[in-house]
Design a protein with these regions (language model features):
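C-terminal alpha-helical "lid/dimerization" subdomain adjacent to the S-adenosyl-L-methionine
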Residues: 141-191, 197-205
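C-terminal lobe and adjacent flexible extensions of AdoMet/dcAdoMet transferase-like proteins
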Residues: 208-220
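A short SAM/SAH-binding and catalytic strip from SAM-dependent methyltransferases
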Residues: 106-120
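Short glycine-centered segments of the SAM/dcSAM-binding site in methyltransferase folds
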Residues: 44, 136-137
Length: 220
């Protein structure tokens, strides 16, 4: 989850339930994520909008070097308690990351882009590309426009909408804008990434894209 462009920290109130409720609901998606980008010992993995670190945990357990960045002090505090000193976790803006060029083998970002204002999403994705090795991969998970399958997709859509409303007005409006612009698939198309693998899950509500950078293309 992201805290990408909001100066306040509206996520503190969700901390007691985040790992207890939200993380388990994503357990199937996490297994798919690991199948798309299996951990390899020694690989450098960054999670942009790392939240409490749930997506990083299996990579750390497999012997990867794990890094995370988030703008929510409360989420990052929970992640630091979880990992101790075994992860390099930074409080910061995903549009201006404190990492060197071409450093990471894998850059993850789950449910991050939809939470940002539209004018910041391109800056964040360009930062992800900057810190990614030329032969590395981006693994993005976020909302998909469908078609939404009945009944599972409709139930999932209602649950997602409920969570978005809980996030507050700005959060909700950013998510609606993201979907109106084509969701994750619509967002990544102008960047001309190579789509190495793709999964649509959650009854059509969620897309996972494993991407590599087309070195011959220019960012939009």
């Amino acid at each position: 989850m992201i805290r990408g462009a909001m100066p306040k920290d509206p996520y503190w109130k969700f901390i007691p339930l985040y790992d207890l409720v939200i993380v388990p609901t994503n357990s199937i998606i996490k297994r798919i994520l690991l199948n798309l980008a299996p951990p390899v010992p020694g690989m450098k993995v960054l999670d942009v909008g790392c939240g409490t670190g749930a997506d990083l945990k299996p990579y750390g357990e497999a012997g990867c070097e794990i890094y995370g960045i988030d703008l929510s002090p409360s989420m990052l505090g929970r992640a630091r308690n979880k990992f101790g000193g075994s992860a390099d976790l930074r409080l910061g803006d995903a549009a201006h990351m404190p990492f060197q060029d071409r450093f990471f083998d894998l850059v993850l970002s789950s449910y991050t882009l939809h939470e940002m204002p539209n004018n910041r999403r391109s800056s964040v994705i360009n930062e992800m590309v900057r810190v990614l090795k030329n032969d590395g991969n981006l693994l993005l998970t976020d909302f998909h426009t469908g078609p939404i399958r009945f009944p599972a997709g409709w139930i999932g859509k209602a649950f997602i909408t409920f969570l978005e409303i809980l996030g507050g007005r700005e959060h909700l409006l950013n998510g609606l804008n993201f979907l109106a612009s084509g969701g994750l698939q619509g967002f990544i198309e102008p960047f001309r990434f190579n789509v190495d693998k793709k999964e649509i899950v959650g009854g059509g509500n969620i897309a996972l894209f494993l991407l590599s950078v087309n070195l011959g293309s220019n960012p939009p």
